[in-house]
Amino acid sequence: MDKSKRPFLKSKRSFRRRLPPIQSGDRIDYRNMSLISRFISEQGKILSRRVNRLTLKQQRLITIAIKQARILSLLPFLNNEKQFERTESTTRTAGLRARNK
């Protein structure tokens, strides 16, 4: 058979199946902070099901647990550290002192 007539065959690459993020022994509970924190972004947002690789039922339970933890103030609603950072800025009184001299 001529090279140009041969059907194109994809090379079979082996791939490792990722472990599920929630094992059968894990309890989805609002008090289980080590489990819940894996499904929250750095900003404090709940990650999507596609990113988490969860089933629909697991994602629903995780979402409810995160919301309960937020209401009970175990988790912050927003995780925005930039808001609390202090930058060196001139205060109003420092500007007045310079003007008075």
From Swiss-Prot:
InterPro entries: Ribosomal_bS18, Ribosomal_bS18_CS, Ribosomal_bS18_sf. One of its GO terms (cellular component) is chloroplast. GO terms for biological process: translation. Coiled coil: none annotated. Pfam families: Ribosomal_S18 (PF01084). It is found in: Plastid, Chloroplast. GO terms for molecular function: small ribosomal subunit rRNA binding; structural constituent of ribosome. Keywords: Chloroplast, Plastid, Ribonucleoprotein, Ribosomal protein, RNA-binding, rRNA-binding. HAMAP family: Ribosomal_bS18. Belongs to the bacterial ribosomal protein bS18 family. Part of the 30S ribosomal subunit. This is Small ribosomal subunit protein bS18c.
